[in-house]
A protein has these predicted regions:
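Conserved, mostly hydrophobic/aromatic
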Residues: 55, 94, 136
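Glycine-rich anion/phosphate-binding loops
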Residues: 27-42, 66-81, 115
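Short, well-ordered coil/turn segments that N-cap beta-strands
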Residues: 8-12, 48-51, 86-92, 125-134, ...
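Alpha/beta catalytic barrel-like cores
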Residues: 1-48, 61, 149, 153, ...
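Glycine-rich, proline-tolerant flexible connector loops at the mouths of alpha/beta enzymes
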Residues: 1, 25-26, 57-70, 98-104, ...
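Hydrophobic pocket-lining residues that define ligand/cofactor binding sites across diverse proteins
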Residues: 45, 82-85, 124, 164
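Active-site acidic/histidine proton-transfer and metal-coordination neighborhood
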Residues: 70-93, 101, 107-111
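Active-site capping/gating regions of soluble enzymes
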Residues: 104-181
């Protein structure tokens, strides 16, 4: 399949995390797993034609969440993943996603998303990631799906752009979003 994709002019890639699991000592939160054996899997994926990969860290917004433990654990995993992907000659898609589940306000989403993205970049820098060789795939700034205080599309755009300008280094060449928000 990768060769067929390449023949059309598209670039094949693959999701390499193995999913979000309960975070020890914070069971309401998740940490993404899949680092064990990743270097070897990446070699195989590259040989098969993959040129980019994706890893998703998920965060919830509640009264005391996301916790520092969840923020740090997922940011560290995203950085380790990115280092291995760049080492293998591929482009990492770094996806720190603050979920829209819940009753939180757009302002809470802005604050938590900024914190999550900034911590991710702190870890990416510590791990010596070439920021010009990644794609960031964050969430948009939205009120929770159960919030009574929704914001307009214009406010979503404005708050998302403000968050990204505040949190993302200029070296990052691309930012992608889910089509559903």
């Amino acid at each position: 399949i990768p060769s067929i994709i390449s023949e059309t002019g598209a670039v094949p890639g693959i999701k390499v995390d193995t999913g979000a699991k309960d975070l020890a000592n914070s069971p309401d939160e998740k940490v993404t797993e899949g680092l064990d054996g990743l270097r070897e899997r990446l070699k195989k994926y590259y040989e098969l034609g993959a040129r980019f990969t994706k890893w998703r860290g998920v965060y919830i917004i509640r009264e005391k969440y996301p916790s520092k433990l969840a923020i740090n654990s997922n940011a560290h995993a995203l950085a380790r993943y990115s280092a291995l992907v760049q080492e293998s000659g591929m482009v990492p898609i770094v996806e720190p996603e603050v979920l829209m589940d819940g009753e939180h306000s757009a302002e809470d989403c802005f604050i938590k998303t900024s914190e999550v993205i900034q911590k991710c970049f702190d870890e990416l820098i510590i791990h010596k990631i070439d920021l010009s060789g990644i794609i960031l795939k964050p969430n948009m700034i939205l009120a929770g799906n159960k919030s009574k205080n929704k914001i307009s599309n214009e406010e979503v755009s404005s708050k998302t752009l403000q968050c990204l300008k505040k949190s993302v280094p200029n070296e990052v060449p691309g930012i992608a979003f889910l089509s559903g928000g």
